[in-house]
Amino acid sequence: MKMVAPWTRFYSNSCCLCCHVRTGTILLGVWYLILNAVVLLILLSALADPDHYHFSSSELGGDFEFMDDANMCIAIAISVLMILICAMATYGAYKQRAAWIIPFFCYQIFDFALNTLVAVTVLVYPNSIQEYIRQLPPDFPYKDDIMSVNPTCLVLIILLFISIILAFKGYLISCVWNCYRYINGRNSSDVLVYVTSNDSTVLLPPYDDATVNSATKEPPPPYVSA
């Protein structure tokens, strides 16, 4: 007979490279934290020196302005929010506080849904890929080579690429979810479940049989004082 904790059942506690889900969630949170910090630094430098990051309409092949002040402020706010969410997930996994992981998990679900929507759009409207490629700047790398590819093959390649991304994102979602369940189980219950190797159980006898057996037993000898 061995003792099994409730939080170790029904799901895996290990993720990629055989590390624990807590370790994987911490590494994932730190990685996202670094990426968003780099993006925030780039946005702040672009806001401080807009001439250095200025792109004209002719360079972009369109009649619109690239990253105006309003869009820049929105992007900075999103980056700050993402840094906060990633920091909360990292802290929650390290300190075993399940509630701190929920915002990061919700972000993963939202990101997965957006990528799924892109895959569905490519599948339903395959001609939209060609239209999007035509709108790219003339000096975009490998634009002519991409345009020369068969449209059906191009759609299949893009769908395969998106499917790989979705599978990887789904795996990361499962790792974070298993970490949440593991921490939530440890914090909410300290009861150990005893698992036996056989199915035998101990049953109490019926009440009538117990009373009859107790009545047929000989009474104890009388007490004699010394």
Curated annotation (Swiss-Prot):
Residues 205-221 are annotated as: Required for NEDD4 interaction. It is a multi-pass membrane protein. Pfam families: Mtp. GO terms for cellular component: cell projection; early endosome; endosome; late endosome membrane; lysosomal membrane; lysosome; multivesicular body membrane; multivesicular body, internal vesicle. InterPro entries: LAPTM4/5, LAPTM_transporter. The chain crosses the membrane at residues 26-46, 72-92, 100-120, 153-173. One of its GO terms (molecular function) is phosphatidylinositol bisphosphate binding. Undergoes proteolytic cleavage following delivery to the lysosomes. GO terms for biological process: endosome organization; endosome transport via multivesicular body sorting pathway; negative regulation of lysosomal protein catabolic process; negative regulation of transforming growth factor beta1 production; regulation of lysosomal membrane permeability; regulation of lysosome organization. Keywords: Cell membrane, Cell projection, Endosome, Lysosome, Membrane, Transmembrane, Transmembrane helix, Transport, Ubl conjugation. Strongly expressed in fetal ovary, testis, adrenal gland, liver and uterus, and weakly expressed in the spleen. It is found in: Endomembrane system; Late endosome membrane; Cell membrane; Cell projection. Required for optimal lysosomal function. Blocks EGF-stimulated EGFR intraluminal sorting and degradation. Conversely by binding with the phosphatidylinositol 4,5-bisphosphate, regulates its PIP5K1C interaction, inhibits HGS ubiquitination and relieves LAPTM4B inhibition of EGFR degradation. Recruits SLC3A2 and SLC7A5 (the Leu transporter) to the lysosome, promoting entry of leucine and other essential amino acid (EAA) into the lysosome, stimulating activation of proton-transporting vacuolar (V)-ATPase protein pump (V-ATPase) and hence mTORC1 activation. Belongs to the LAPTM4/LAPTM5 transporter family. Homooligomer; upon reaching the lysosomes. Interacts with MCOLN1. Interacts with NEDD4; may play a role in the lysosomal sorting of LAPTM4B; enhances HGS association with NEDD4; mediates inhibition of EGFR degradation. Interacts with PIP5K1C; promotes SNX5 association with LAPTM4B; kinase activity of PIP5K1C is required; interaction is regulated by phosphatidylinositol 4,5-bisphosphate generated by PIP5K1C. Interacts with HGS; promotes HGS ubiquitination. Interacts with SNX5. This is Lysosomal-associated transmembrane protein 4B. The gene is LAPTM4B.
